[in-house]
């Protein structure tokens, strides 16, 4: 079997896709004669969806040198009042015996050159060491988030309080290399509640990042603030010990030709052909990720703001969540689109706007000549897709580490405009604020400057993955460390 690199993905489609993209980049650069890729993944998580096996079959067929090994089904230990992340982290730990047996079996017929794990799979770190396999983390966020995560155990140590971050409304925290402080209430969602087991899990994960052989990051050096790269390289983020080597190898995003196979053909063609008829850089694209969702009241405010702005738009609307306070939905259930929007909105904006239900081919849409702006939930994959396409953003974070990303996109990278969210109302944004930010991005001089900056970054993103680019060089350095 030769040399193999084993990747271990956290549960959930997004984590598996990120690992696949890393595997594809390695094989694309070195060829299957140098390395094959094996991706380990779990079975039975509460975040699993029906699309995962379909995706894996497709990748197995189109990329034969990437193989998948699914673990036996494990039952979630679901307890009342325990959060989904805490249940998921416990589920991952229950899979440790399967990790051990997989590495043992693979090692019998091949040389495992590296074991690359997701941050949430930290319990597998000592298992890699058991087999004397160099073990690396794959960070699917940017360098600024990595800097924050490396420093988080220090903040935990220094925060002499029993209060949770979600309750520290007047407190801000500084991270090495960041230009502006972060509100305590905008910390990564996993650590907002000190009483949630996910809090101590996350601190544990972050404290183990420096104990790996290195960290691979899905970003490229030219995108990141120099102060952040210097803070990581200079050891400021891990003040009590050495920082392992860090390899920036992005932007790794899913290819258009693969995405298109999963699309609903008719609706996809409708929105793409509509975009082809619009003037250059005139359309605002609104899409909030695979799970981002709003209650009906917020959808109506967005609609009012779009209508008042007078701008062209393509808006992906998902079914409102069952719980009013939730900002996530799983799956793409059907719903009455007209029923969640203001009466007559679709008719009044039909000459300049298009609303699609649940899904649009985001990578393809962002690359259309007519798209001039992107309202995003600030998920890192979406950010990279916009950067590659050279499209400026309006940052509207919803959950996970997205508020942290917003800070960096607006203040440090200067590639987005932030919306003003009412924290006391669950992040509610008024229609007037939507109109204001849409006009600022699409009509103002500041928006034009942002667009020019993003266009240049798009060119840099392409260059980073080129033969002499920074990300290719960093991948070569990583491979040198394992061979």
UniProtKB/Swiss-Prot annotation:
Highly expressed in roots and at lower levels in leaves, flowers and fruits. Its EC number is 2.4.1.357. Optimum pH is 7.7. Optimum temperature is 25 degrees Celsius. The keyword Glycosyltransferase applies. Pfam families: UDPGT. Keywords: Glycosyltransferase, Transferase. InterPro entries: UDP-glycosyltransf_plant, UDP_glucos_trans, UDP_glycos_trans_CS. Gene3D superfamilies: Glycogen Phosphorylase B (3.40.50.2000). UDP-alpha-D-glucose binds at residues 140, 360, 362, 377, 380-382, 385, 401-402. CDD domains: GT1_Gtf-like. Glycosyltransferase that possesses phloretin 2'-O-glycosyltransferase activity. Converts phloretin to phlorizin (phloretin 2'-O-glucoside), a potent antioxidant. Is specific for phloretin and does not possess glycosyltransferase activity toward caffeic acid, catechin, chlorogenic acid, 2-coumaric acid, 3-coumaric acid, 4-coumaric acid, cyanidin, 3,4-dihydroxyhydrocinnamic acid, epicatechin, 3-hydroxybenzoic acid, naringenin, 3,4-dihydroxybenzoic acid, quercetin and rutin. Can glycosylate phloretin in the presence of UDP-glucose, UDP-xylose and UDP-galactose. This is Phloretin 2'-O-glucosyltransferase. It comes from Malus domestica (Apple).
């Amino acid at each position: 079997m030769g040399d193999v690199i084993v990747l271990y993905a956290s549960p959930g489609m997004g984590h598996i896709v990120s690992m696949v993209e890393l595997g594809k980049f390695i094989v694309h650069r070195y060829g299957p004669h140098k390395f094959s890729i094996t991706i380990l993944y779990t079975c039975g998580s509460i975040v699993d969806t029906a699309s995962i096996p379909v995706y894996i079959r497709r990748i197995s067929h189109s990329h034969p040198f990437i193989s998948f090994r699914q673990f036996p089904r494990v039952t979630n230990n679901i307890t009342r009042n325990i959060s989904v992340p805490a249940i998921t982290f416990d589920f991952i730990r229950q899979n440790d015996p399967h990790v051990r047996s997989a590495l043992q079996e693979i090692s019998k017929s091949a040389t495992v050159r590296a074991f690359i794990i997701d941050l949430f799979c930290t319990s597998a770190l000592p298992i890699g060491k058991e087999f004397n396999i160099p073990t690396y983390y794959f960070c699917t966020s940017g360098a600024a988030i990595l800097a924050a995560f490396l420093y988080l155990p220090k903040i935990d140590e220094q925060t002499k309080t029993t209060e949770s971050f979600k309750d520290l409304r007047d407190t801000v925290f500084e991270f090495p290399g960041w230009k502006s402080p972060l509100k305590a209430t905008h910390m990564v969602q996993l650590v907002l509640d000190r009483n949630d087991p996910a809090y101590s899990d996350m601190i544990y994960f972050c404290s183990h990042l420096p104990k790996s052989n290195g960290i691979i990051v899905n970003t490229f050096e030219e995108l990141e603030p120099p102060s952040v790269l210097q803070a990581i390289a200079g050891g400021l983020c891990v003040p009590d010990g050495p920082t392992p080597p860090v390899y920036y190898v992005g932007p790794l995003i899913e290819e258009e030709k693969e995405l298109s196979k999963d699309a609903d053909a008719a609706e996809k063609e409708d929105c793409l052909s509509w975009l082809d008829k619009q003037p250059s850089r005139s359309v605002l694209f609104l899409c909030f990720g695979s799970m981002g969702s709003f209650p009906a009241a917020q959808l109506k405010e967005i609609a009012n703001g779009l209508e008042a702005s007078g701008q062209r738009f393509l808006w992906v609307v998902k079914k409102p969540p069952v719980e009013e306070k939730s900002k996530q939905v799983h799956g793409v259930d059907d719903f009455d689109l007209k029923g969640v929007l203001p009466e007559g909105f679709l008719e009044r904006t039909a000459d300049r706007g298009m609303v699609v239900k649940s899904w649009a081919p985001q990578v393809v849409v962002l690359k259309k000549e007519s798209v001039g702006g992107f309202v995003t939930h600030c998920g890192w994959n979406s950010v990279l897709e916009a950067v590659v396409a050279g499209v400026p953003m309006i940052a509207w974070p919803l959950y996970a580490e997205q508020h942290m990303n917003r800070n960096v996109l607006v203040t440090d990278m200067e590639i987005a405009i932030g919306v003003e969210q009412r924290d006391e109302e669950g992040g509610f944004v008024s229609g007037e604020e939507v109109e204001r930010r849409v006009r600022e991005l699409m009509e103002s001089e500041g928006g034009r400057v942002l667009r020019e900056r993003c266009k240049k970054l798009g060119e840099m993103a392409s260059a980073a993955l080129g033969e002499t680019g920074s990300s290719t060089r960093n991948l070569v350095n990583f491979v040198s460390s394992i061979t």
